[in-house]
């Protein structure tokens, strides 16, 4: 059964792919092509533009405040790791160590770094606020798309930290110790679209129609029914056994690429933390009967569309994360959840309210630039707007294999973030201090 029709002509590259595949492919395959194909994909080709004048806005594209608020959390985690390693930061940051070739002992790893704006802002914040820590740290950019990597290299020429670009497979060959940041990355992993036909869950596929007298157009059609091996997954999400409130035609997404992504991420980190920042809903809300067509949406030039088949390769395709699926996949991949919060709550805990208040009081000897202050105020409020970026969720994970540092080894930097000293050596193995963004503001 056809569930959606797109009236746009089918690009020749996609038409040939579909013909070579027998006429149709799972939606998951189509989404991967539309986003990550090196020549035709929105990300793979580098066609997509991020920012106020681009296709969509992200938190770092609103200005440096997001990175400035996030930096203390990342610095705290990096300092904890330094203590776990028994690393003396003063010695490690000294001239003898600086002269050594090769990777630095700590890494800030960003996956899917977009334009490179957040990586640059974080590197600058670390170098300014925690110079000893920054001297022991490098930026590792995990970017599979050549078009985006080229733009990141240009942007990060100004980075105060050394930068390396690696694919996930290469990082797994030489794992590092550090913090992994996945900001608006997992929502671009290809999802599986499924549809209830009244008796079975069916995988949705993408094909093209060839009606006489009409241009070719893309369609979503029902494919094979899901086998019994998928019932445990469906049951864990509340999709099995069938609920009569979900009538024929009810459709949604599954996230099969989360588990391999998280496992790959774990393979590249011998010891560390992981911070995922993305749109997310609990399974109860994601798969609520009243959500008739999932969360899949397309973005281009600040316009949102509910049609994922529109001009393939020219639109960003994104779907919310299911927080239950994310936490389960992380656990299976060797990560342990430290906690989660909405972005609004996280940024308030990290000092956003104080930053807003500070806009009213100019630095001694400086005049208050009202226009600049109002623009920054608007950007800060957008970061916590519950109808927008404030609805993002932050998920903090740690590797279960991370050992406690031997007592007395390692020295954290003198300019640690506020709060208890990170990861004191007296803590029992396996226990971690509460991340800063999970503390009450």
Predicted regions mapped to residue ranges:
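Conserved acidic residues
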Residues: 177-178, 272
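A mobile, often basic/glycine-rich helix-loop segment
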Residues: 179-238, 289-299, 435
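Long, Lys/Arg- and hydrophobic-enriched amphipathic alpha-helices
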Residues: 234-441
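A residue-level signal for conserved active-site and pocket-lining positions in enzyme catalytic cores
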Residues: 34, 180, 326
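Rossmann-like AdoMet
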Residues: 1-111, 115-177, 345, 354, ...
């Amino acid at each position: 059964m056809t569930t959606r029709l797109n009236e746009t002509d089918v690009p020749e590259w996609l038409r040939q792919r579909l013909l070579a595949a027998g006429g149709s492919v799972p939606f998951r395959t189509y989404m991967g092509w539309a986003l990550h194909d090196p020549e035709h994909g929105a990300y793979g080709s580098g066609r997509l533009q991020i920012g106020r004048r681009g296709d969509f806005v992200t938190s770092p594209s609103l200005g440096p405040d997001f990175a400035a608020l996030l930096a203390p959390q990342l610095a705290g985690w990096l300092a904890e790791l330094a203590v776990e390693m028994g690393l003396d930061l003063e010695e490690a940051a000294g001239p003898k160590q600086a002269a050594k070739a090769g990777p630095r002992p700590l890494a800030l790893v960003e996956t899917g770094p977009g334009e490179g704006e957040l990586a640059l802002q974080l590197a600058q914040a670390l170098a300014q606020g925690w110079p000893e820590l920054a001297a022991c740290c490098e930026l590792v950019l995990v970017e599979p798309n050549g078009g985006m990597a080229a733009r990141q290299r240009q942007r990060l020429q100004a980075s105060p930290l050394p930068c390396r670009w690696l694919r996930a497979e290469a990082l797994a060959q030489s794992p590092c110790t550090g913090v992994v940041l996945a900001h608006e990355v997992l929502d671009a992993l290809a999802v599986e679209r499924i549809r209830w036909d009244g008796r079975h869950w069916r995988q949705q596929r993408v094909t093209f129609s060839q009606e006489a007298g009409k241009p070719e157009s893309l369609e979503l059609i029902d494919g094979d029914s899901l086998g019994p091996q998928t019932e445990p997954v469906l049951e864990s999400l509340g999709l099995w056994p069938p609920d009569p409130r979900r009538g024929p035609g009810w459709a949604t997404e599954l996230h099969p690429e989360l588990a391999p992504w998280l496992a790959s991420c774990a393979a590249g980190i011998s010891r560390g933390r992981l911070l995922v920042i993305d749109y997310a809903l609990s399974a109860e809300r994601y798969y609520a009967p009243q959500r008739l067509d999932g969360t899949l949406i397309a973005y281009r030039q600040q316009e949102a569309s509910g049609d994922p088949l529109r001009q393939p390769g020219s639109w960003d395709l994104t779907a919310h994360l299911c927080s239950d699926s994310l936490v389960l996949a992380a656990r299976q991949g060797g990560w342990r959840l430290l906690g989660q919060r909405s972005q609004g709550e996280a940024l308030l805990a990290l000092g956003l309210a104080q930053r807003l208040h500070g806009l009213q009081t100019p630095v001694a000897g400086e005049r208050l630039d009202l226009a600049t202050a109002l623009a920054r105020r608007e950007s800060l409020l957008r970061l916590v707007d519950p109808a927008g970026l404030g609805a993002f969720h932050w998920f903090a994970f740690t590797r279960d294999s991370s050992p406690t540092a031997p007592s007395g080894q390692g020295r954290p930097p003198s300019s640690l973030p506020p709060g208890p000293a990170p990861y004191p050596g007296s803590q029992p193995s396996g226990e971690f201090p509460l991340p800063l963004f999970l503390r009450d503001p």
